[in-house]
Amino acid sequence: MKTILYTWFAVLLFGMAAVSCGDDDTKNNDTTGITGSSWKASETVGADRTTKKSTFKASANWVAQSDKPEWCKILTSSGDKGSDRQLNITVEANETGSTRSANITVQVSGYARAAQFAITQLGSSSGGTGADTELNKQVDKILEYYYLWNGEYRQMSRDLSLDYISSSDNFLKRTLLEMTTNDLDKKRQSNGSYSVYSYLLRTPLTKAVDGTKPEVNHGVAKKKEYGFGIAGLMGVRFVDGNNQPTGEYGLVVTSVYPDSPASEAGFRRGTFFAQYNGAAITAANLNSVYGTLIAPGGASTVKLTENKQGAQPVSLTAREIYPNPVIHSEVITSGAHRIGYLVYDSFDAAYDDELLAAVKKLKDGNITDMVLDLRNNGGGHVISSNMLSTCIAGAACQGKVYEYYRYNDSRMATVEKTARETGKEYDTAAKKFFDEFYYGDYYGVDLRNYALNMTRLYVLVTGNTASSSEAVINTLRGLDGFTVKLIGEKTNGKNVGMEVSKFTVGNYSYELAPISFQGYNAKQVTVDKNGLAVDTACEEWDGELKDYGDRSEPMLAAALSQITGQRSASVSGTRSTAPGVRPATDIALPDLSNRPNGMIVFLPAAEE
């Protein structure tokens, strides 16, 4: 068994290159090891989104790469030798108005030369600068009014001709990064660069939504997406006997969506694989392998081999699934304690029915204590965080303030107008707008039937715990007599939220969510921008990741120990120092999930 070095993935991978094997290891310096390829040296596609499929014969295991993975993404990025090998590439719609190109390389193991070809995509005849300028005008108007730091924004020079390249590269992102007063909107990446929490998402008008009528009648609809059901991955790097990296990697599953190809194949939190389509995972294919598994974009098939003796490849085929963030719930019995355990990965209001079903399961189990696992929850819809907080606290929160809101100075100066726009009341003593807990009616559902009536809550957290997740912690701490204990690592520290605007330009609908308010609990305490400190420090891995609900999983074990008073052998406040295993924070990959993050409030007209 190989020794492994664990690595966390959250943001874009920079500067990683394939390790050269040297001339002595090559079979032929003049050929590529590929014959019978169906691609041409230069391929041209139209501006619309398309998937291009090619076939070829490979003399050995192979790896494919794109130098523009943000819009030209390889779905089958590696494979074994043989004839009729397939290379599937998704090219996203081009709304930039300009022709763009991507270079594709296919490297066969043992061959010095790689096969190469180019894909050129034409610019949109109906999009381009004109369409993007119209889009930017709408974004600009909304930012001038809603953005929390609109004073500086109104004074700066803005380039309305910037193209919408992607959700991470557009007028909104570029302009807000130039500002200086909006420090609470900025987040520092592991490579030292910055991004902003405010976002602009684009969706084709033809994308379907679920027609099933939910019990909760707020109108936030479910949306299917292609996926294997792998909700999160943690990377691992192999090291040799001297604890030095070998150049090979593996991936460990951190969460699996219910009713998905991955869950049906037996994948769970902690499943660890080191081969992808029969080939090792290396620096050369790590980015594309990760991207394919998290966001395949179509019905692709992959083969994954677990890192254990005698493991056989397991085939997974992506299909349209519902990314249900309610990952796990159960009642744990220990002596007189009946402990409710809930793992929740995103405050996605589209799945409020599923969340309420999980809460009802705990209520019917007559729980005496509760552990809420938000370690992977980056936030989402405020209405869902209010709903869950209400269910946890029960009758104690009736008629109490859930959260106070501070908007920009111009909106705070026009109280009546802002009250009409937001649907929130104004507290003249606190000089802030507010929402109450939803005890009673929640969009047609009586939350009194789901009241758990807890007075103490244990929350499992990490640096990925943010926004609406932190709001649950902070707002419950705002209730007199309610105790919240944090176990794990310091949280993210995001105390600001967004109001969502939706509009259409051309063939796309847009969701714009600029940071527009700061949140406070009933005691007018906001979340520390440096993160919420934990009461008990604990790291979630110690040579492996254990599944949710495993009583020896370090963070859960720490919570159970505090509740029952029985110390578990798994409880530890420090990371394992076992030889050959150490954390690495120098490598990072993009967050490609479509789960809502942040602290999101729908304006009354935007609830649909």
Regions inferred by a protein language model and the residue ranges of each:
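Bacterial Sec-dependent N-terminal signal peptides
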Residues: 3-6, 11-42, 109-133
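Surface-exposed binding patches on compact interaction domains or structured appendages
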Residues: 33, 57-88
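Short, solvent-exposed loop/linker segments at the N-terminal edge
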Residues: 43-48
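Exposed beta-strand face motif in extracellular beta-rich ectodomains
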Residues: 52, 85, 98-102, 300-302
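A short beta-strand micro-motif common to beta-rich folds, especially ectodomain repeats
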Residues: 87-89, 97-110
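Surface-exposed loop/turn motifs at beta-strand-loop junctions within extracellular Ig-like
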Residues: 93, 108-110, 306-308
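Flexible, low-complexity junctional segments that flank or bridge functional domains
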Residues: 126-371, 376-378, 384, 390-394, ...
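C-terminal "post-core" interaction segments
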Residues: 339-342, 350-369, 378-608
